[in-house]
């Protein structure tokens, strides 16, 4: 895995997410209770970008087009119609910079 600086910690609002690009890969970065999480930004049900069509429910991200939800900690589907989990990326904060491990 390659660790890439993707954002500054302050760029991600608490309780929400922002989309960043990591070597051409759209990544959704979330901040909840000060912790940073990252998943693919692409809905596994219809391929839209989650950052453009989402609502947060604690550790769940909902795609508002079809109301499916995933747990951002594991990528697991919590509410269908999606059946495929979101890809989850390992994150690390170093000196207020957010790093994500991408392939």
Regions found by a protein language model. Give the residues of each.
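Zn-dependent metallo-beta-lactamase
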Residues: 1-21
């Amino acid at each position: 895995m390659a660790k890439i600086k993707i954002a500054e910690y302050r760029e991600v609002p608490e309780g929400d997410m922002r989309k960043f690009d990591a070597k051409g890969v759209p990544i959704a970065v979330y901040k909840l209770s000060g912790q940073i999480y990252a998943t693919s930004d692409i809905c596994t049900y219809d391929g839209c970008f989650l950052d453009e069509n989402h609502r947060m429910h604690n550790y769940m991200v909902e795609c508002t087009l079809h109301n499916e939800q995933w747990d951002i900690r594991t990528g697991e589907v919590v509410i269908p119609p999606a059946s495929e989990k979101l890809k989850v990326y390992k994150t690390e904060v170093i000196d207020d910079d957010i790093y994500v491990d991408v392939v």
